[in-house]
Design a protein with these regions (language model features):
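Catalytic cores of enzyme domains
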Residues: 139, 144-356, 360-367
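Low-complexity, intrinsically disordered regions enriched in charged/polar residues
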Residues: 75, 82, 244, 360, ...
Length: 415
């Protein structure tokens, strides 16, 4: 088993022209995402319509409003991660009126010689006008910063939120390109968890905070090359992530509602985005047979503890043809979970949630290429016991902060 998800595979090591850690060059590329999108019907969403925002506002009652404030920090590790992610909230774009190292202009010493932090450089850097070379360079830079997968697309206008969550102000974003950065939530931990125990939120925030950290640095780097760029991460989005992932060739929409599923990571990742005007060659959407696979599998719908995921057919919703999901039920489950912190059972049980080993890459290839094998794939997944927690290797501590005290919860699997 490859424990380090960042280890590049042997194929890449032997082919220096391959820059991606996963064999994305083997995927079938298509002109349109496999999810039908009726662009005339897609409207730009107000970010305050999200389930979590509504919970924090009190739309689901006082108890949920209180739980919303503690459902991540009630577990000490996810609390540490959300603090770090929060520190990145104001580092997404060039600071207004700030100088070097984030100091106010008035406080910057006159003899300071380096470029002010985060500003778009006045002169464009040499060698930045070739879109093919720059796309390759930006991907290599993101991988150097420890991204797991990267894709690039033109930014669809309908992916831009209409209004900000923080202050409700209208969003004016006119960047041409979007760079999507995926971070794996860790297979080693995913194998052990039930999906809704005490490590669940930490897996999410590992990927939220890391992808946000990389996006903020990448956006700052691009601004230093002389082009506008803004990072978008869990603590400060101006764009909806799923349509960008579809167009950037990083996955297909799956049965788990608005979730995009990647052929190498499954749904076990979180993403951050950089939008920019730096000229970049774009990727194309991918088709690995997921629409057919999800139509047959339905494992997430069966296992979802809140019954939020439908086992029925797709419907047209806000211009997307997708499987419906009950966002309110899902939000209440994740916030109100008394047996753990958060919930990701759908991610845990998905047959595409596998390690990057030769055996699993072979199975994945078969599922992608041979439609008749897909039913056997779901059956074999159950037979081999994937989807069940493996607490024999559990590494984390079960703890819950209650009224300021750390306690061992009744649901603890500590051994
Ligand atoms: Fe699709 Fe099955 Fe994964 Fe659900 S569990 S997203 S139906 S492949």
């Amino acid at each position: 088993m490859i424990r380090n998800p960042r280890l590049r595979n042997r194929e890449q090591a032997n082919n220096r022209h391959l820059i991606d850690p996963y064999p994305v060059h083997t995927l079938k590329r298509v002109d349109q995402p496999t999810t039908r999108i009726n662009e005339a019907e897609v409207f730009r969403q107000h970010e305050q319509t999200s389930g979590f925002y509504r919970a924090g506002r009190g739309d689901f009652g006082e108890h949920m409003q209180q739980e919303y404030r503690r459902f991540v920090p009630k577990y000490p590790l996810s609390g540490a991660m959300v603090s770090m992610a929060g520190a990145l909230a104001d580092l997404v774009d060039e600071p207004v009126g700030m100088g070097a190292a984030g100091m106010p202009d008035s406080a910057v010493p006159k003899n300071m010689s380096w470029a002010p932090m985060g500003q778009v450089a006045e002169k464009k850097a040499p060698f930045t006008d070739n879109p093919e070379k720059m796309a390759r360079h930006i991907k290599e830079t993101a991988y150097f910063l420890r991204a797991d997968l990267v894709g690039i697309c033109e930014l669809p206008v309908y992916a831009i939120y209409s209004h900000q969550k923080q202050d409700g102000k209208p969003i004016h974003l006119n960047h041409k390109y979007a760079i999507a950065i995926l971070i794996d939530q860790d297979w080693h931990t995913s194998r052990q968890t039930s999906g809704n125990d005490w490590i669940s939120n930490s897996m999410s925030f590992l990927a939220y905070s890391t992808s946000g950290f990389i996006a903020c640095m990448l956006a700052d780097y691009i601004r230093r090359l002389g082009y506008p760029a803004r990072a978008h991460h869990a603590m400060n989005y101006q764009v909806a992530v799923p349509p960008i992932l579809l167009w950037a060739g990083l996955g297909e929409m799956c049965r788990i509602g608005d979730i995009v599923l990647n052929p190498f990571l499954g749904p076990r990742f979180k993403a951050a985005i950089v939008t920019t005007d730096l000229p970049l060659a774009i990727d194309k959407p991918i088709d690995f047979g997921l629409q057919d696979f999800c139509a047959k599998c339905k494992k997430c719908a069966t296992e979802c503890p809140s019954g939020s995921i439908s086992d029925k057919d797709k419907v047209m919703y806000h211009g997307y043809e997708k499987w419906p999901v009950d966002v309110d039920k899902c939000t209440k489950m994740r916030i109100g979970n008394k047996q753990g912190s958060g919930c990701g059972v759908c991610i845990k049980v998905c047959p595409w949630n596998k390690p990057n080993t030769l055996f699993h890459r072979s199975i994945s290839w078969t599922m992608r290429k041979l439609p008749f094998a897909r039913r056997f794939g779901v059956w074999g997944d159950d037979l081999l016991g994937y989807g069940k927690p493996d607490y024999n290797h559990k590494w984390w501590l079960d703890l819950e902060t209650i009224n300021g005290d750390l306690q061992v919860p009744n649901s603890s699997k500590n051994r």
